[in-house]
Design a protein with these regions (language model features):
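Glycine-rich phosphate/pyrophosphate-handling loop used in enzymes and phosphotransfer proteins
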Residues: 1-187
Length: 187
């Protein structure tokens, strides 16, 4: 098997449990590439997961004053390796990369069994450009079902906007007509 990021050949490691359960090791990365992704540690904002803090960050304090409670969960820091991953996955359309975080995401999503997963949609233009919805593909690869409740207005891509432009953008999503909204939703 080859690493999905660097193409290096990886040796298959057979374990007793993988033989007994007839499961393959689902690692898609070599140890070198895997080590470039940094998990978020204990020092983080409890609301948005911004690293290096142990209390609510300034952004979350601002949103809280505005009446918006931020509840974001992240597993990894957004370092250069993650930026490169998302560039290849989203902008280059490397569909195979959906498998890279499938097992990690699967373990994390198990914590939210009582929630219904709702995937943020792409605009029609963005879907046509990319050929697939990246979040749908990640959730599928992790083995979870999701609800299709939202639509998106056409607008300029978020990736082409500055941070201040993104913060000033009107919410581009709306609920499809005739759908039932579950009580607990995970976006």
């Amino acid at each position: 098997m080859k690493c999905l990021l660097c193409g290096q050949t990886m040796k298959a490691v057979l374990t007793f449990s993988s033989l007994l359960l007839l499961k393959n090791d689902d690692s898609c990365l070599c140890s070198d590439c895997d080590s470039t992704f940094e998990r978020i540690g204990e020092e983080k904002c409890p609301n948005c997961m911004k690293t290096g803090l142990s209390t609510k960050c300034q952004d979350c304090q601002f949103w809280c004053k505005e009446g918006v409670e931020v509840s974001h969960r992240a597993i990894f820091t957004y370092n250069q390796a993650m930026k490169d991953f998302f560039s290849r996955y989203k902008f280059d359309g490397d569909f195979l990369l959906r498998k890279v975080f499938a097992s990690v995401l699967s373990e994390e999503l198990k914590k939210y069994k009582e929630y219904q997963f709702v995937v943020i949609p792409l605009s029609r233009d963005r879907y046509a450009d990319r050929g697939f919805n990246q979040v749908e593909s990640l959730v599928d690869a992790a083995g979870f079902a999701y609800l299709d409740l939202l639509e998106k207005r056409e607008e300029r891509a978020s990736s082409s906007k500055s941070r201040s432009e993104r913060l000033e953008t009107e919410f581009p999503f709306f609920i499809k007509s005739g759908v039932t909204i579950p009580k607990k939703i995970l976006l």
